[in-house]
């Protein structure tokens, strides 16, 4: 019932009023950055009380969430209100926008809250201080406990306004943690808040992967003594076995249409890549080789699958058609390359290379542009955000193993969660 209530709460987030979207959002970006000399300076003003009780903690939390999201976003140099700017209200004409422009601000976020019992209404407004005009205005109503999600939603709206594509900030990250003494699967906001435990089977659970609609997770569990593949409905907790053949049933990943999963199975004595229906029927063997083949990853159009094979002596990343034909090697540098994952745009893959510890690399689908993204500690399990702008991964750089996020070019590496045990195998949900 807890998960049902969570789902109902998410559905209850109601957009009360929405101003028309900016049609030429890329033009807005060009207007503000016409000089090409700097990132956008984005100021987040402190939220104002628009009615009802004061709540300083609420105002602080909203500002912190917005600043964190926009700092990670990258095109923005994020700042608190600079000296000499007009506080005033939040709507056009209620404050001096020129004072913000004169303080070097390109973009300004104003917000306010109204508290009524357990309900809070948040109003957000985005201004182009350089051009002296409003770009977006949104109002949301929800429970006090919904506040972080409401704020992340407006961060997504800012990205939509400025780039033409929504941000990923309302997404969740599923991951594995040993905090309970076992490897269990957990779920959290992308920034490490609102952590909840999903599995409680006191066993080893690995490699969670979100379904395309974000409502299910596929994962491998040893709960019955064999590494079997399960799928779990996130909001109800309902589970079903997908593959329990003798031997391994691991690294399961969903096809883009959600009808199949690709996984590695050893049902025939050797680890090979298979495709199987979501209910476990009709397994189709895709690779036929005496080497070990594991870690399949679908291309976003569903036409190709990347995977790892040691058929040339050491693990390397290969690509094949979704029916198993036309196998070709992708990685040619490094002696040990694993854990590939296709970008949502389909133009690149990320993977891990062993260099003492593991480091994360990004490579184009034709094998060019092989670029190292990490350097500190050992870094594994890279997974893309749904918009392809960011990655989540695990790292040991601060001692232990924790969950991080970064931009897709390797910049902005930020720890978002560190548990009492080890945290690993993160995966970013589709947009909910």
Swiss-Prot record:
Keywords from the UniProt entry: Cell cycle, Cell division, Periplasm, Signal
InterPro entries: 6-blade_b-propeller_TolB-like, PD40, Tol-Pal_TolB, TolB_N
Alphabetized Gene3D superfamilies for the sequence: TolB, C-terminal domain (2.120.10.30), TolB, N-terminal domain (3.40.50.10070)
GO biological process: cell division; protein import
Top-level taxon in the UniProt lineage: Bacteria
Signal sequence residues: 1-21
GO cellular component terms, A-Z: periplasmic space
Location in or out of the cell: Periplasm
PANTHER family, per the entry: PROTEIN TOLB (PTHR36842:SF1), PROTEIN TOLB HOMOLOG (PTHR36842)
NCBIfam families assigned: propeller_TolB (TIGR02800)
Description of how the protein assembles with itself and partners: The Tol-Pal system is composed of five core proteins: the inner membrane proteins TolA, TolQ and TolR, the periplasmic protein TolB and the outer membrane protein Pal. They form a network linking the inner and outer membranes and the peptidoglycan layer.
Family: Belongs to the TolB family.
Function of the molecule: Part of the Tol-Pal system, which plays a role in outer membrane invagination during cell division and is important for maintaining outer membrane integrity.
Protein name (record): Tol-Pal system protein TolB
Lineage start: Bacteria, Pseudomonadati, Thermodesulfobacteriota, Desulfuromonadia, Geobacterales
Gene: tolB
């Amino acid at each position: 019932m807890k998960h049902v209530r969570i789902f109902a709460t998410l559905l209850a987030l109601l957009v009360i009023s929405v101003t028309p979207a900016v049609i030429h959002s890329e033009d807005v970006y060009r207007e503000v950055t016409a000089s090409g000399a700097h990132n956008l300076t984005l100021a987040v003003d402190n939220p104002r009380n628009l009615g009802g009780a004061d709540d300083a903690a609420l105002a602080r939390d909203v500002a912190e969430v917005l600043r964190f999201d926009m700092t990670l976003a990258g095109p923005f140099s994020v700042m608190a209100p600079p000296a000499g700017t007009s506080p005033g209200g939040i709507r056009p004409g209620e404050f001096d926008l020129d004072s913000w422009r004169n303080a070097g601000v390109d973009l300004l976020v104003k917000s306010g809250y109204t508290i009524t019992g357990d309900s809070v209404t948040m109003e957000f407004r985005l201004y182009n201080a350089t051009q002296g005009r409003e770009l977006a205005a949104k109002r949301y109503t929800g429970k006090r406990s919904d506040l972080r999600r409401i704020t992340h939603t407006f961060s997504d709206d800012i990205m939509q306004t400025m780039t033409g594509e929504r941000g990923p900030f309302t997404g969740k990250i599923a991951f594995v943690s040993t905090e309970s003494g076992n490897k269990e699967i957990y779920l959290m906001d992308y920034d490490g808040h609102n952590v909840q435990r999903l599995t409680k089977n006191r066993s080893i659970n690995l490699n969670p992967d979100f379904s395309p609609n974000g409502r299910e997770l596929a994962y491998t569990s040893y709960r019955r003594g064999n590494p079997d593949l399960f799928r779990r409905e996130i909001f109800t907790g309902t589970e079903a076995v997908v593959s329990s053949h003798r031997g391994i049933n691991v690294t399961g990943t969903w096809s883009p249409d959600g009808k199949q999963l690709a996984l590695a199975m050893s049902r025939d004595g050797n680890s090979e890549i298979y495709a199987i229906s979501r209910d476990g029927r009709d397994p189709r063997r895709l690779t036929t080789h005496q080497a070990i083949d594991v870690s399949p990853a679908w291309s976003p159009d569903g036409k190709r699958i990347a995977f790892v094979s040691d058929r040339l002596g050491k693990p390397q990343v290969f690509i094949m058609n979704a029916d198993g034909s036309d196998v070709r090697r992708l990685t040619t540098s490094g002696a040990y390359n694993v854990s590939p994952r296709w970008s949502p745009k389909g133009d690149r893959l990320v993977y891990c290379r062993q260099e003492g510890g593991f480091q994360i690399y990004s490579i184009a689908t034709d094998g060019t542009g092989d670029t190292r993204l990490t350097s500190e500690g050992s870094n594994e399990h890279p997974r893309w955000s749904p918009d392809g702008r960011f990655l989540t991964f695990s790292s040991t750089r601060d001692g232990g193993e924790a969950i991080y996020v970064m931009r897709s070019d390797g910049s902005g590496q930020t720890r978002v969660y560190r548990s009492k045990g080890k945290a690993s195998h993160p995966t970013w949900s589709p947009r909910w």
